[in-house]
Amino acid sequence: GLLAACSPGTTTASAQTPAPATAARHPVSGLEVIDLVVERGTQKLAFKVEVAASPEAQAKGLMFRTSLGDNEGMIFPSAVPEPRSFWMKNTVIPLDIIFVRADGTIESIADNTVPYSMTPVVSGEPVAAVLELRGGLAAQKAFRASTSCLRSCGRLSR
């Protein structure tokens, strides 16, 4: 698994176990949906995120989506930490693009990215995953680089 598990005692090996056939699927994308918690101090915020694990799913991302709920998002895991670059081509709504280190801490946040922009949004260092949320949500919830931590309650592998 790329990010730490939500439950104490969950091992990395169990985090890499294939998801059961009954895994929740998103009605629009068909992608697996997992629980993800962002911790900021003692505050824990729960999200249901789609896992864009395949190259095709990562290339499409949230293109053409017209809405994204406050507790919804999409995560783009990497097999190994690597520099990541995203753009907003064909993306209708503003997004917060959150770059996540292998230990689950936030490396950086690109707030309220501009819809349809072809300007690359890049990580400042190699990252293990990228989380996209509704634009403005990271600031509203006071997520901060290095002080906020993501925890996955599902399989996060590519």
Regions found by a protein language model. Name each.
Residues 2-5:
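C-terminal motif of bacterial Sec signal peptides marking the signal peptidase cleavage site
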Residues 7-158:
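Compact, glycine-rich, soluble single-domain proteins
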